Amino acid sequence: MELNRVVITGMGCLTPLGKDVPSFFDALKRGVSGAGPITRFDASKFKTQFACEIKDWDPSEHFDRKEARKLDPYAQYGIVAARQAVAQSGLAEANPDLDRVGVIFGSGIGGLFTFQQEITAFAQGDGTPRFNPFFIPKMIGDICAGHISMEYGFRGPNYACVSACASATNAIIDAFNAIRYGKADAMISGGAE
C-alpha cells in the first residue's frame, strides 16, 4: 500500500495568548503568560483563583446572535480557529471534492459552560425539569466538528476525539491517518475546550 504524503496548509488558533496564529506565536516567543484572575465566575471559594481564559471574547464578532446562542463557547472557539485554518489553506477556493474533506476535532469535556448554566438554572428553579432545547446540542463533544462540516459542506470523515488532555492530539493523528491512508484528501483538525 502506498502511503499519501501529508502536509499542513493552514493553521488557526484562539488562545489566552492570542486570537490568531501570529499574535499567539509572538506572545509565545516573548514568554507571555496566558494565566490571570478568573473572570467567568466567582472563584472566591476556591483555593485557585487564576486560569487561562480567552480574554475579551465577543461571539458577535464571529457569529450572528441566533447562531451564537446555539453554540457553547468551546465550539465557538473551535469554529473560529477552523475558519482561520481554512482561510489560510485556501481550501474553500480550491473547489475540493466535498466527500473527500473531513473534520476531526477533540475536546476533553465539550460544553461544560452550557452544562453548568443549565444545571445551575435547574437547581435554582422551582424544581420543574425545564431545560433549554439546545442543552444537548450545545454541550455534546462532537458539535464543533459537526458545525464546521456543515458550515463548509464537508462530507468526509467527521467525528470528535474525547481522550482528556490528549483529545486534540488524537484528533490530529486521526486526521493525518485519514489522509495518509487515502480515506480523505483534506482534513480540518484540532481541539477546543
Map each language-model feature to its residues.
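Residue-level "edge-of-site" marker
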Residues: 41, 162, 192
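Short, flexible active-site-adjacent loop segments at beta-strand->alpha-helix junctions, enriched
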Residues: 107-109, 165, 193
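Acyl-CoA/ACP chain-elongation machinery
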Residues: 185-193
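Short conserved active-site loop signatures built around small residues
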Residues: 168
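Active-site histidine-anchored catalytic micro-motif
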Residues: 171
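Short loop-beta-helix segment that forms the pyridoxal 5′-phosphate
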Residues: 157-163
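Conserved "HGTGT" condensation-loop signature of ketosynthase/thiolase-family condensing enzymes
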Residues: 1-157, 177-180
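Internal active-site segments that recognize and position negatively charged phosphoryl groups
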Residues: 174
